[in-house]
């Protein structure tokens, strides 16, 4: 096996020309930032004027958080891992004061026991996206 390998996600959100959905490097899987895009929905709109890399799930922070974590689940499954293999999460919220508690409630539905290390910060996120999550998972190859 190569030292690093692109993780392809056939049932995940649309691919991007400028990044890999995830990279496996040895026993670690590094997932790019994921948002609440619906799987199988193509990019739409005009670049620079409302362009989206796919169709964003309707609803608020709760819906976007669930879809984002489900997208991470799909990505990790494509790499042979699960949400339980995540060791570190970085979360970016458009409005941390407004959305943190609702995001955290949904997050805790997925990570009930031994949750991963996590950082959550506020960030200006593209278009109508309220949340972006990236993660690192540990899943030995052998």
Question: Predicted regions: what is each one?
Answer:
Residues 1-70, 74-87, 93-142:
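N-terminal presequence-like segments and the immediate start of the first folded domain
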């Amino acid at each position: 096996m190569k030292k690093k390998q692109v993780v392809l996600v056939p049932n995940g959100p649309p691919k991007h020309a400028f990044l890999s959905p995830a990279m496996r490097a040895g026993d670690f899987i590094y997932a790019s930032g994921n948002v609440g895009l619906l799987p199988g929905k193509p990019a739409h709109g005009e670049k620079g004027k409302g362009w989206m890399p796919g169709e964003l799930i309707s609803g608020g922070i709760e819906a976007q958080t669930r879809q984002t974590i489900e997208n991470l689940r799909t990505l990790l499954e494509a790499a042979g891992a699960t949400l339980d293999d995540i060791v570190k999460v970085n979360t970016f919220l458009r409005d941390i004061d407004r959305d943190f508690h609702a995001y955290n409630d949904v997050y805790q539905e997925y990570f009930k026991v031994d949750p991963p290390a996590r950082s959550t910060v506020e960030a200006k996120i593209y278009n109508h996206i309220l949340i972006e999550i990236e993660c690192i998972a540990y899943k030995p190859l052998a």
